[in-house]
Amino acid sequence: MKRSLGVLVFVTLIFGAATWRENVTRAAAMRGPQAQATAQTPPTIASVLDRDISNVEKEVVDAAEAMPEEKFNFSPEGLNIPGSDFKGVRTFAVQVKHIAASNYFIWSPITGDKLPDGLKDGNGPENLKTKAEIIRFLKDSFALGHKAAATLTAENILQNPGKSKSTRIHLATFGVAHAFDHYGQMVEYLRMNGIVPPASRAQSE
């Protein structure tokens, strides 16, 4: 499943770059030779991946900031919904820390960075309790993602960094896919508390 997600995101990256180039070329041609020369700055693997990291980063960070601090430890288990089985599921805070922790675990092999102090598992450091601390941890993890994306080239994307068993492109794209996966769970937690996710507010107004 993880490999399939990585392949899907990789194909999307390549298709997106090709579509972008076609659209830019067509638009520049309509504006004349000078505009065409200025507009044709081709995307790179690094720039396309960096854009996708920015996209998921905005969705996740905005969702995290939308949840009031007093609701950060909310879990669907506490709703006691008849017929449901939410026993032991992560709280909203741990969902956010899980995304950040996974970002570090997935992207640090690409950059060679050491893991932050206290990061031992997928639930993130136990000492991070407040909303501000958790969101800072989240933002820092995406900064590592941008750093990882900047290292990608056509020559190294199929190499395995360090002792990793995965290629650079698989790690880079899987980080994006994983974050989007858990963003979907964050959305459900927000809606269970009567909060419309920021990304959906324009659509609902």
Segments predicted by a language model, with ranges:
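N-terminal pre-domain segments of enzymes
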Residues: 30-44
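Bacterial N-terminal signal peptides
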Residues: 8-17
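A generic structural signal for well-ordered alpha-helical segments enriched in polar/charged residues
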Residues: 58, 62, 66, 143-147, ...
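Short, flexible helix-adjacent loops and helix caps
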Residues: 68-72, 111, 150, 154-157
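Positively charged n-region of N-terminal signal peptides that target proteins for export
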Residues: 1-4
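Acidic/histidine-rich alpha-helical segments that form the ligand environment
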Residues: 125-160, 170-182
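Signal peptide processing junction and immediate N-terminal pro/mature segment
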Residues: 19-34
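Short, contiguous alpha-helical
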Residues: 50, 54, 58-61, 73-122, ...
